[in-house]
């Protein structure tokens, strides 16, 4: 067994870590630190924050040699085979992120991949102690004899920790039950929360999701669930774990104590929570075969991330709808937003879903100003594919099967193998075969067309989408809520510190034709100073004219003519936002 001891050093924003373990049989201990975190497919290079690694046998310091960016070898030739080794190191922890480590006076967080140096090629149990007077520690692992117990390395690296001051300052910790399972909620970063409202709504999310996956017994695949969340201005994100999740949110989206009507963006939080909770089944149990087990030392490639993130993105809004947390109008509004997020980028038909999945390591998580023109997201586009696949299943089975039924059947079929760790995962590109095995319905042609076939034009997607919507009594129409001239200009502002920057500028738009690009800082339009609050109205006032726009590109002041009078190209018009409405 591996024995870890973690000590926080608040003023230095560091954790010191000690690992005690037996001397290996060949007297050479090979240690490594993960380079990425499951669920976040980009190399994070955590070893860059690790310092002062030392090795000891009793009071004797042993040689430590670094052999790669994240691997070390301890020469324990001087130590007898029956001895124990003590490895010590420090990790800098001052990054607010779901996949990082953080420590200050108010809060600590540990994503295990950032901290746990471990022997190579091992999967043995581990226990984690904290020397942290004045702190409460929360983790999804079982706690026995003051140590958090992990059955294996995978469980150790999948169980994050939140540290909160024992005086309770800025921390909200409570437990709710869903289908008989305790769900602990740990929220830091705010002094006021309406816990009763959040408890009621989260319980509905949890119970609805459990019923989705196990409609008969309503039994989740974990004995305890831990939702950890930190709040801060402008924060947003989530990362799934087998028995919990780590979320980031802006405090403005949550109801404060005594606030009876939640903020307008509260549904954003509920949707995020539903997304990550859904992942406890789809990603943490049902997963690609290449992730069994995870190799966190290098990139691990899959063409199927569109399944695991795209399907989840589809159901993240369906769950709140079924839980009666949003109405049908809000659901279809979110649906339309997802449609626009995908098809509003020119990169939508520049990459297949299989390519987008495979290239996650260098594209999705490494966005550039060119990304909207050349890339698509397997989240948003994957959700559209999921919708079309489900519609095809429904049509070919006369309503007997849908994607939901496939997921339920899939989990039911392999659940026992997942529990006893004998399941080998979904082979790369094997979803069509899986569907046929479960349903007897051939669906390979549909998946091949929407997932792997290159150069499928967005017109085909829109046509297929329109047909699928008709089956549900819905149709697409241009979003009349958008200011027409503003939408037709290709100009979209975002805040960047004290500046206002242009976001993605579609090619063939008037803004693009005028030479504007993402990152430019517009300061005046038609002789008037630009402000964020009135920018759309300013553009509306220029409709049908050619006007002057003044902007900075870097430190250079530039003046261009913006043509808002000429007809727009069909290619650009296809990028305009649409919404879903009733057929009648």
Located regions from the model:
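A surface-exposed beta-strand-loop module
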Residues: 7-9, 40-103
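Extended, low-hydrophobicity, Ser/Thr/Pro/Gly-biased non-transmembrane segments
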Residues: 34, 88-167
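Pan-zinc metallopeptidase signature
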Residues: 342-425, 431, 444
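Beta/coil-rich, acidic/histidine-enriched accessory regions frequently appended to metallopeptidases
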Residues: 1-3, 7, 13-15, 88, ...
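Juxtacatalytic substrate-recognition/specificity segment
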Residues: 172-304
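Solvent-exposed beta-hairpin/edge-strand motifs
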Residues: 32-61, 125-142
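Acidic/His/Gly-enriched intrinsically disordered linker/tail segments
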Residues: 287-294, 299-379, 417
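Early extracytoplasmic/domain-onset interaction patches
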Residues: 1-36
């Amino acid at each position: 067994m591996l024995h870890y001891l973690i000590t926080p050093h608040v003023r230095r924003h560091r954790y010191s870590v000690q690992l005690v373990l037996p001397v290996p049989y060949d007297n050479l201990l090979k240690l490594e630190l993960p380079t990425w975190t499951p669920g976040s497919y980009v190399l994070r290079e955590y070893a860059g924050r690790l310092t002062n690694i030392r090795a000891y046998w009793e009071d004797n310091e042993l040689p430590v040699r670094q052999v790669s960016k994240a691997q070390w070898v301890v020469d324990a030739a001087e130590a007898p085979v029956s001895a124990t080794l003590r490895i010590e190191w420090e990790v800098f922890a001052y990054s607010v992120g779901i996949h990082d480590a953080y420590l200050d006076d108010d809060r600590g967080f540990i994503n295990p991949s950032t901290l746990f140096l471990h022997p190579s090629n091992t999967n043995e149990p581990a226990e984690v102690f904290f020397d942290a007077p004045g702190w409460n520690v929360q983790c999804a692992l079982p706690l026995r004899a003051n140590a958090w117990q992990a059955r294996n390395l995978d469980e150790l690296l999948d169980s994050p920790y939140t540290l909160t001051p024992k005086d309770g300052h800025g921390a909200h910790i409570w437990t709710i039950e869903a289908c008989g399972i305790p769900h602990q909620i740990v929220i830091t970063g705010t002094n006021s929360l309406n816990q009763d409202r959040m408890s009621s709504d989260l319980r509905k999310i949890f119970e609805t999701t459990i019923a989705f996956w196990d409609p008969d017994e309503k039994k989740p695949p974990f004995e305890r669930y831990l939702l950890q969340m930190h709040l801060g201005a402008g924060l947003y994100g989530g990362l799934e774990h087998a028995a919990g999740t780590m979320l980031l949110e802006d405090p403005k989206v949550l109801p404060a104590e005594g606030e009876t009507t939640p903020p307008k963006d509260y549904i954003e939080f509920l949707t995020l929570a539903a997304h990550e909770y859904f992942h406890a089944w789809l990603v943490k149990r049902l997963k690609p075969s290449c992730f069994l087990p995870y190799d966190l030392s290098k990139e691990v490639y899959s063409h199927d991330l569109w399944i695991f993130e795209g399907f989840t993105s589809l159901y993240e809004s369906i769950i709140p709808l079924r839980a009666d947390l949003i109405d049908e109008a809000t659901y279809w509004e979110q649906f339309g937003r997802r449609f626009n997020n995908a098809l509003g980028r020119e990169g939508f038909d520049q990459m297949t879903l299989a390519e987008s999945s495979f290239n996650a390591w260098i594209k999705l998580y490494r966005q550039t100003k060119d990304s909207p023109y050349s890339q698509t997201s397997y989240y948003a586009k994957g959700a559209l594919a999921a919708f079309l696949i489900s519609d095809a299943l429904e049509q070919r089975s006369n309503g007997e099967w849908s994607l939901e039924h496939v997921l339920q059947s899939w989990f039911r079929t392999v659940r026992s193998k997942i529990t006893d760790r004998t399941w080998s995962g979904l082979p790369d590109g094997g979803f069509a075969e899986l569907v046929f095995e479960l349903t007897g319905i051939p669906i390979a042609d549909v998946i091949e067309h929407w997932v792997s076939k290159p150069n499928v034009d967005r017109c085909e997607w829109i046509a297929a989408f329109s047909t699928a919507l008709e089956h549900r009594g819905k149709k697409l129409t241009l979003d009349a809520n958008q200011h027409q001239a503003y939408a037709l200009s290709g100009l979209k502002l975002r805040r960047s510190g004290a500046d206002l920057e242009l976001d993605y500028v579609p090619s063939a738009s008037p803004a693009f034709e005028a030479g504007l690009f993402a990152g430019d800082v517009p300061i005046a339009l038609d002789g008037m100073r630009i402000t964020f609050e009135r920018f759309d109205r300013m553009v509306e006032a220029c409709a049908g004219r050619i006007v002057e726009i003044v902007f900075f590109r870097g430190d250079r002041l530039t003046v261009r003519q913006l043509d808002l009078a000429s007809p727009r190209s069909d290619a650009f018009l296809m990028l305009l936002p649409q919404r879903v409405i009733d057929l009648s």
